[in-house]
């Protein structure tokens, strides 16, 4: 069971990610800074309440948002990569395929 304080913390983290998603500077350090804590404290807090590290949480959020954009828009894959703040196309394809088992184009066609 998640405590209210932990839920509020994760809501704050998610809001920061949404606000900065298109920036390739979105990293745990940025989140920690915006929350007024150091990066080690952010990692400790995540370890206490999540199975993911802050870095993995950001990556997972980016991939989920990209998947949503593939289904709900006609944006090109390149435009989606830009919108989710990833600057390396091959990295995006590798991570997307690892998470969903198909390429972004295949994912779009399947939906």
Predicted regions mapped to residue ranges:
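Append "Primarily bacterial transcriptional regulators
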Residues: 29-37, 42, 46, 80-87, ...
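Terminal helix-turn-helix DNA-binding modules in bacterial transcription factors
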Residues: 48-87, 109-111
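Conserved catalytic/ATP-binding subdomain
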Residues: 4-7, 26, 40, 75
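…primarily DNA-binding HTH/wHTH and HhH modules…
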Residues: 94-111
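Short, Lys/Arg-enriched, Trp-marked, Pro/Gly-tolerant hinge/linker segments that flank
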Residues: 1-11, 19, 33, 48-56, ...
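Basic, amphipathic alpha-helical hairpins
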Residues: 14-26, 46, 50, 67-76, ...
């Amino acid at each position: 069971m998640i405590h209210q304080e932990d839920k509020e913390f994760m809501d704050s983290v998610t809001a920061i990610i949404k606000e900065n998603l298109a920036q390739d500077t979105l990293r745990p350090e940025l989140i920690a800074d915006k929350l007024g804590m150091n990066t080690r404290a952010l990692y400790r807090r995540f370890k206490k309440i999540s199975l993911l590290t802050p870095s993995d949480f950001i990556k997972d959020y980016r991939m989920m948002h990209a998947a949503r954009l593939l289904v709900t828009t006609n944006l090109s894959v390149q435009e989606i990569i830009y919108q989710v703040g990833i600057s390396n196309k091959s990295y995006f394809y590798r991570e997307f395929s690892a998470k969903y088992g198909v390429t972004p184009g295949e994912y779009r066609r399947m939906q």
